[in-house]
């Protein structure tokens, strides 16, 4: 791992390069060395560096160009010197009228000074609290006030507002009109008849014009209101009507024309016109700073030219409105809550004025990610380096975009907490995505494997004595006999077989195995021990002192494995290298054609041993498995099997690496076993593996995370952590699913107040899901060599285990141990309803997600992209649970009448 560079180019001397031309770890007698004249290292490295630099610069330019493209300047009319008026709510950030928190006179005076530079008119909505001081303060700045009376179901408050407003209208020179109620009919808080009574009362008590302010269509629905007002005050807000911004201006003028035609004798006041700068999309209406700037700058100029009276809603952002109107309610101001101008009044409009800073930030973040991805990346082909460069820049750009977009939100303690958790989740998603991309690149786009442990076939090679240990617990005797027959046929000069049956209660199960061993000769020894603690690890530890004293290697296979005759002959000679402590062959299976269920299981199993283990072997970081594995006896006697861990094999392999020893792996099969017969057994097996992984991480945190007191290399630490990271991500996904369901429930119960989560937080998990499924299909096609159908089967089976893995991860973090679960062999399949009940948790969560999606569709519809995206996310989130049900159903189908014979092993 030395010689790290951004581009994966490591300077090596000429001797090292020549040695790399031969197989590094085959036995000397079998090495083939072809002399080659190496290209001068300096010239080759310079050429590679130059090519990598060009690729990085090209991709950096591509993403920077994308930032420039989405932020290209758009022309719009300059803001006029004066507009007709501003709607004004004076609440500062952190103030809530619902809690009777009102601004001070000094705060309102500063607001009025800002507005007085742009208009002569303001509209207020209430005279409650300190808002009654606004008319007096407005006189200081020469502002005319349209006074509002807030009408609500609270009759006592209504009476206070009316009395106070009448007094202000009759005593303040700044009040030029009175508005009784704001969308009170639209909110169904009062009827048109009741409002007419209030209007008549106020008109009789004041000398200025009186009206009520409603959405334009309310005036069309209740034309009788016109008899009780002096002018028509209408809200025309195209955003709420799902009108795209490019058609919104014409929509305003069309509605104004209709109202003038309907009420020709009444003056028209457009009492609210505006556009929000943030919030959910509504159909084609996008709430963005650029759209707000373009729309308002264009609209107010046209309104001025045509002589309309209007109020722009609103002068200042009002974060408190989010609780009543949804998040978009906070963002209608021309100035933000800190009283800063939100967009430029002159010149071209740019969506994100500081986009260059963001582009630079994304490049820096991408280069940091790429540096980590390219550590020890000299073996990657150019296509692999290009792919990782693209992924790094994509992740960097999206992360910067997420950070920027979230920074533009108004936050409460609740939203900050949720945002922080979502940000951590998004960061975790991108870390997982980068590690998945790294594995993909190293599996497909690599010059050659760094550590090839090919079969050693020379007759004169190192052939030490091997002791083969076969642990059994409650296994079918006939199956174990097949395993013993295969061992008896091994083509190897010196080996013994120790079979241990621990804790099997029924003599009819273990005694036939004991008797059969007696017929196979002195090589085979049988042990039955009950009780014996420590699960499988305890049984294997029991056999160590009973191993022949001259045995140098201890091999372990599961009781269902039929091994190839050449297994020991081909693989044991690798122990001639004193650094090699473990030699591992892949797990493989012979019953994949027994049922559709097992075909899917087989496809899923195959990937790890032909993709993950192969790439891990390049950095000497394989996962040791408790079958088809061999360990140097001296090492095993020193370390022993961990009886505290339910994945004692993987834990032993890690301790081997921690001592600075090495492992050898060859990806071809030398033995085949049996897969689980039912979905519940398939799940329990994977639960044990994932739970054991968390046990190991917890026990070895010091060496894995900190590199303390260990001989682990950085590459080994990376592979152990990165290899288990997707499982940890599955565990964290449970919290995301629960959060999504709770949020969706709120969207259904109070749709007017709860919007879908920000798109920026819904995209990362969806992107990771799509990438992982695509990666599985691509890698199975390229690295494993299967057809598209089998690749899809692997993806389906893998998805079906997501919930099981998630549970195992959470159990692993919050418990210290669970009972060891043996995977049954030759078990009967379950009926349909039993199989479905074994996936009842997945079924329940799937129905919840589908119900949430349906509920949102029925209550809110899917009028906007963010709503469609959220519903799609809920449905995609349900796919792993659907996959689990499919697997459960397939496992319930009847088996063939007779089980197939063990297939020949290769």
Located regions from the model:
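Aromatic-rich peripheral "rim/lid" segments of glycoside hydrolase catalytic domains that contact
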Residues: 77-80, 93, 97-100, 281-291, ...
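Aromatic- and acid-rich polysaccharide-binding/catalytic face
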Residues: 147, 176, 214-255, 275-276
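Membrane-embedded multi-pass helical conduit in multi-pass membrane proteins
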Residues: 382-431, 458, 726-819, 835-906
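Cell-envelope/extracellular polymer assembly enzymes that use nucleotide-activated donors
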Residues: 465-467, 496, 651
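Short, acidic, metal-binding catalytic loop of nucleotide-sugar glycosyltransferases
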Residues: 484-494
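A conserved acidic beta->alpha catalytic loop
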Residues: 493, 501-513, 530-533
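Long helical/loop segments within the catalytic core of UDP-sugar-dependent glycosyltransferases
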Residues: 515-552, 565-646, 651, 657-658, ...
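The conserved acidic donor/metal-binding loop of glycosyltransferases
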Residues: 558-562
